[in-house]
């Protein structure tokens, strides 16, 4: 046993296992789950602790190495009080999902102590803070607020108590008290692991689980693929075991006997389209997974090619002819090019995780999910259980970004193993699994053509997209161009190209960033050919009223207005500015919200989940405004499927669904409270007094339809898309309970970049973003989320490079040491402007922003690189080798 001091108290490990890591001792033996395991490689900093006054990562630290030493975790920073850094993080909303927050807080507290001792009264600069926190990553992208919080804490501005911060759960996140699915520990809980295929394409010929059941500590084993089944990608689930600990579970997996009949495999977009390529789905039935958020319609197949789907084209045949004729005559105003985007891993810091527990025929699942209400129904259907017997809980969710919307392997394994073992089972993916088999933003090839007339009008547009989502289909990329730019003829065609790779998944604006990267560069090229300002051309071609206002706003911003003065187009380091625009649909669900008075206090509840967006605080703020109270006066209960039916966190529908429902509930409750208080309290008494004097009452309201908008003629963008658009709109409402609202969100962004022409490095030095999403319900949290979306877009444009073994399809960048996401030093200061008009027909006046905020980032950066260096990069990420090769050729690459 190893003895050491833990948060000021003596502690001793349970055994002398030489392979035992400090993080395992803290989480599994001491129950201090504030210290998080993310990368397991010392890269992300989430597991940071203080050992004898210095910070260290506990995921690499042998437990024996701390013998006789002092270890402080986030729980022990300030005892029952809050450390100044924790207060600063609360005040500045220096977090989103909160999974990485304890590590940041511990590191920042160490910086605070050394800074205050050496330089009291001074404020550290952004570069000094970035250097100190360089070993920490935040996938949500809360870096700007983190820098502000650390700077003010080190300057001594948080030495005393503070008022409540903007985020209700902030104190739990900065102290490590917030409980995520991976932190759940039931009495007698077992650990589950999944055995995965080592073949990219094979027939499963044998599967024997009996040897695993003979391994000491193994309590259950299940098959996840049947003998004779087709194995279609490396990492596909084969079987799973549950054991008393992870070590026993690993031995159980190793004992399972598996037989394969290897079959020819095809890896990637180009190989799958090659003549004679092995077929992923050779039979007439094509059991392909859905990589999109919408329903799948019957679509023709030709070997590995699914499509075309061109239902949202507008005079597509005319567009095709106009562009073909322009090519034939070599029209100088024709812009045409092929663009490539690579897959992007979601990289949520809390992995896919499920803990299942049966009680008779009732099932409780703690699940890291973006859809607790939906998942409760899906689990009931999948396992043949009544919906009233299933409860899904997600108190906190450590990120998702689209990857946690459906039932996946961890849920199936946990539920089946728990039933087989007769005990609770947790299945939590390790980082390699999380970044290999849980989905990714599909890559694509886009062929784009724009034809302008002699007077500068847009005559025709063509977008053909070939999506690369592995064994999955249903990507929509080209279709979104129907809602961008007013061309009388548009040929918009989507294809899916299947190959033996894990299925892709929705990721923040599915299809949108890919289209924007290609289309917005083509618009810039058209402006160059027409010799007009790129912003002015967009203003002419784009009739959307929301974006029209944003173009006018952007024209006045120094980053755009003064770009000729700030540009540097010679020498090694060059600077340029690029612009891009985007749109996204406005969606909402017919959800319910319960508003209640209990014990003289007002509370709101619904079965929604918070993965960092701050929906708790949005609900509290909305209720507080309706009743003239403060946000902290409102109780909020979410994260439980037994509450009023809530929305999925996807497609930017959450706030747009819940706020109108809550306002409807507020109107009902006000009427009821007035009626009950009549004769007891004056008619003009403030709501605070009426609520305090009221008996307990609870009522629910459903999200009402929007009022007709005169601007949009009462129609959604899909309903304006002809017969097919109206049909798609109906299918969404009928089968997915998803309504497409009137109008769409808009974005107009400008990026300034510096290009190192010697080393090929590109960095973003300034970023200015304009968003049109109607009334912003919680400005502090909205700004934080928008900035994080932009930072994910910067990663997509410059750094994130998912590499595969060309023979097997195994992901070679399945760790944060190999797959680079932006760190705090990679991100610029970001200025965000919200145009809050245009959605007065929506109760509450606003819609969602999580998707739209990511869409135009990569395009704006690519356009800025062209402005700075004179070369156009048609492939992302914009790696140094690609940039240098383009500079050497002096042409697009």
Where on the chain are the PLM-derived regions?
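Short glycine-rich loop/turn motifs
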Residues: 1, 44-45, 190-191, 227-228, ...
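Signature of N-terminal electron-transfer/Fe-S-associated modules in redox systems
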Residues: 1-164
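Intrinsic disorder at enzyme termini
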Residues: 9, 127, 131-181, 554, ...
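Glycine-centered tight turns that cap/initiate beta-strands
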Residues: 70, 211-220, 389, 455, ...
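Short acidic, glycine/serine/threonine-rich loops at helix termini
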Residues: 108-112, 143, 151-152, 252-255, ...
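C-terminal catalytic domains of large/alpha subunits in multi-subunit enzymes
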Residues: 123, 384-391, 419-425, 476-580, ...
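Extended, polar/acidic
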Residues: 156-378, 500, 504, 550-583, ...
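Terminal domain-initiation and capping elements
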Residues: 159-172, 262-289, 293-317, 323-324, ...
